[in-house]
Swiss-Prot record:
Residues 211-229 have a biased composition (Polar residues). Belongs to the ETS family. It is found in: Cytoplasm; Nucleus. This is ETS-related transcription factor Elf-3. The gene is Elf3. GO terms for cellular component: cytosol; Golgi apparatus; nucleoplasm; nucleus. One of its GO terms (biological process) is positive regulation of transcription by RNA polymerase II. Expressed in small intestine, colon, lung, kidney and uterus. Also expressed in the corneal epithelium and conjunctiva of the developing and adult eye. Not detected in liver, spleen, thymus, brain, heart, skeletal muscle or ovary. Disruption phenotype: Mice show about 30% fetal lethality at around 11.5 dpc. Approximately 70% of the mutant progeny are born and display severe alterations in tissue architecture in the small intestine. Elf3-deficient enterocytes express markedly reduced levels of TGFBR2. The keyword Transcription applies.
Length: 391
């Protein structure tokens, strides 16, 4: 009941703000005891006011003007935040805006299921949104996809090239179910046999460990301790398998707005690489393949392929294995795309990197921000090793 009251208050405030300028009779006051049915009735009354019957006055036409709806959106608090960080109130405001923008019949919306924050909303699949919002679910899903992946177009071409270099990750280990366990609609859609959420994080599959990672199989079986791994950061395996435990949805770090972009790629596809280059990649795989399966290998492969670097990272001292992140959030998003995790941030990625300190695969460079060093148990980054793998 408390959730329904909160939903009703948000929708009431929304329509009061939109309809109170000229004629207060156009916005009927909600009843004292406001339930889900009353909320649907109020929204339907608003649409009857907008759409008829009878000719519209000038003031009514102004209220359906797209410019008026846009002006209302500019005043909403959700426009200044990423969807993953929206509060429950901001989610309801955004839903209200979409209902008004699309002139949608609100009677088909199941408002009892709208009590969720932005992280939960972003974890919903298209089928889940259709269950709650009916045909409007397609529009909401498309809008969320645009808002949460505004930088994916810029980086997706790098993923394609990395995967052509033999760095595609293994098949999922088993079938743990199509939805994140935090989704409020997972069980219902599991019963219906629906498809998996596009925001669900894939798990690691079996594969031969690369050099320097002989005890990865031990880490895979150590998931019961993963909830206590926040101090040491946990492995990249822990990050994917138990992210909802290590990083709860209501604990996202503040996103740094206005982070400067370095070396942004011009529009269009990158230049075509020579046939000899692709023959080298496809015909003569490195002895360290499969590559890029683990986080430290992913970082290494970006560094040893300047044609893929695109201003993301640079060598500070190649001989000593010292490197620096130039666009830390962009690298984190690349890793998130590779692991099907749309909520990846540099803070989470750096925590996972700490896992390699104890194994002496990576080292911290004291006193220098965003600077790290490959340890004695790492491999494949030295110039002589790279030369051997390409011969």
């Amino acid at each position: 009941m408390a959730a329904t009251c909160e939903i009703s208050n948000v929708f009431s405030n929304y329509f009061n703000a939109m309809y109170s300028s000229e004629d207060p009779t156009l916005a009927p006051a909600p009843p004292t005891t406001f339930g889900t049915e009353d909320l649907v009735l109020t929204l339907n009354n608003q649409q009857m006011t907008l759409e008829g019957p009878g000719p519209q006055t000038r003031s009514q036409r102004d209220r359906t003007d797209p410019l008026a709806v846009l002006h209302l959106a500019e005043k909403a608090s959700w426009t200044s935040e990423r969807p993953q960080f929206w509060s429950k109130t901001q989610v309801l405001e955004w839903i209200s805006y979409q209902v008004e923008k699309n002139k949608y019949d609100a009677s088909s919306i199941d408002f009892s299921r709208c009590d969720m924050d932005g992280a939960t909303l972003c974890s919903c699949a298209l089928e889940e949104l259709r269950l709650v919002f009916g045909p409007l679910g397609d529009q909401l899903h498309a809008q969320l996809r645009d808002l949460t992946s505004n930088s994916s177009d810029e980086l997706s071409w790098i993923i394609e090239l990395l995967e052509k270099d033999g760095m595609s990750f293994q098949e999922s280990l088993g079938d743990s179910g199509p939805f994140d366990q935090g989704s409020p609609f997972a069980q219902e859609l599991l019963d219906d046999g629906r498809q998996a959420s596009p925001y669900y994080c894939s798990t690691y599959g079996p594969g031969a460990p690369s050099p320097g990672s002989s005890d990865v199989s031990t880490a895979r079986t150590a998931t019961p301790q993963s909830s206590h791994a926040s101090d040491s950061g946990g492995s990249d395996v822990d990050l994917d398998l138990t992210e909802s435990k290590v990083f709860p949805r209501d604990g996202f770090p503040d996103y740094k707005k206005g982070e400067p972009k370095h070396g942004k790629r011009k529009r269009g596809r990158p230049r075509k690489l020579s046939k000899e280059y692709w023959d080298c990649l496809e015909g003569k795989k490195s002895k360290h393949a499969p590559r890029g399966t683990h986080l430290w290998e992913f970082i290494r492969d970006i560094l040893i392929h300047p044609e893929l670097n695109e201003g993301l990272m640079k060598w500070e001292n190649r001989h000593e294995g010292v490197f620096k992140f130039l666009r830390s959030e962009a690298v984190a998003q690349l890793w998130g795309q590779k692991k099907k995790n749309s909520n990846m941030t540099y803070e989470k990625l750096s925590r996972a990197m700490r896992y390699y300190y104890k194994r002496e695969i990576l080292e911290r460079v004291d006193g220098r921000r965003l600077v790290y060093k490959f340890g004695k148990n790492s491999s494949g980054w030295k110039e002589e090793e790279v030369g051997e793998s390409r011969n």
